[in-house]
Design a protein with these regions (language model features):
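Conserved beta3 VAIK motif of the Hanks protein kinase fold
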Residues: 98
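A solvent-exposed, charged loop/short amphipathic helix patch at secondary-structure junctions
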Residues: 111-123
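Surface-exposed, glycine-biased beta-strand/turn segments
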Residues: 19-94, 102-107, 122-123, 129-131, ...
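Bacterial Sec-dependent N-terminal signal peptides
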Residues: 1-25
Length: 154
């Protein structure tokens, strides 16, 4: 009797399991041309695993990078290793970190330059208030580049 009870309980646990509903999320592409990868996530590098996706830009610097969905700019950085970096939080719960950019768009570009002169330092970090720099899906947020520790435009 006990064996049947345990078997029935185990079957009920396996069949009736339901965690959470999968969200249906859509994104717009970050570029207005066909996407081709030049670097994959998890790819083995000389001293680490690659932590992102790199998209080819045809060897061109300065192509518009677009927001994938509605959201806001959550962090702005200029670093020696990653160059110009823009973090975006999207209202759908996802986020992106855009590295190696050639530049930012207005008004972020002006704010970064002002802070660089004030600090007399090329490396800066700005953490804006949530919603201070809102973005819409498809909006130009930066320019593709080759800054920092990068081996070609992407």
């Amino acid at each position: 009797m006990m064996r049947r009870y345990i078997t029935a309980l185990m079957l009920a646990c396996c069949i009736g399991g339901y965690g959470q509903e999968k969200k249906q999320v859509t994104f717009v592409p970050p570029f207005d041309f066909p996407l081709t990868l030049s670097g994959n996530f998890g790819e083995i590098r000389s001293n680490h695993f690659h932590g992102g996706l790199d998209f080819k830009t045809g060897g061109v610097i300065g192509k518009p990078v677009r927001a994938l969905a509605d959201g806001y700019i959550s962090r702005i950085r200029v670093t020696n290793g990653s160059g110009y970096v823009l973090d975006v939080c999207y209202h759908n719960g996802y986020s992106t970190i855009n590295r190696h950019l050639s530049g930012f768009v207005s008004p972020i570009a002006e704010r970064v330059e002002k802070l660089q002169y004030e600090n007399e330092n090329w490396e800066v970090e700005i953490i804006p208030e949530p919603g201070e720099y809102p973005v819409k899906a498809g909006q130009k947020i930066a320019l593709s580049g080759n800054t920092g520790y990068s081996f070609g435009p992407h």
